[in-house]
Amino acid sequence: YPHCAWDFLLYVARNIASSFATIHEHGHVVGDVNQNSFMVGRDSKVVLIDSDSFQINANGTLHLCEVGVSHFTPPELQTLSSFVGFERTENHDNFGLALLIFHVLFGGRHPYSGVPLISDAGNALETDIA
């Protein structure tokens, strides 16, 4: 949305955060947080379109999310070779949510994609996040 007004972008960010809160209130986790999980309408309404990888708590039976996009994965999970058998938390989602909001407000940029001021940074987003 390069031509959208700031207030529109703030409403979109708020609506994405609200969708995460609703999912969390029901005991579930988004898990595979990424920029392709949502569609945004002209009225700033947000629609979830990628829910097949949610971590679902169905009356005490936990159905895990076994996939994820590394650019939206929190630092403490960057070293995992696989998400198979790993239980995610709301806090893991919140890291991805913060990145999504940053993307919305700053033209699709990732907060770890800036120009590094030290020589060993900037080779890969995953290592910069970790």
Describe each region flagged by the PLM.
Residues 36-78:
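Activation segment/activation loop of eukaryotic-type protein kinase catalytic domains
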Residues 88-92, 101-130:
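Conserved C-lobe activation region of Hanks-type protein kinase-like domains
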Residues 1-12, 61, 67:
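Conserved structural core of kinase catalytic domains
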Residues 16-23, 101:
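Conserved hydrophobic alpha-helix
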Residues 20, 24-41:
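Catalytic-loop of the protein kinase fold
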Residues 77-91:
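Conserved end of the kinase activation segment
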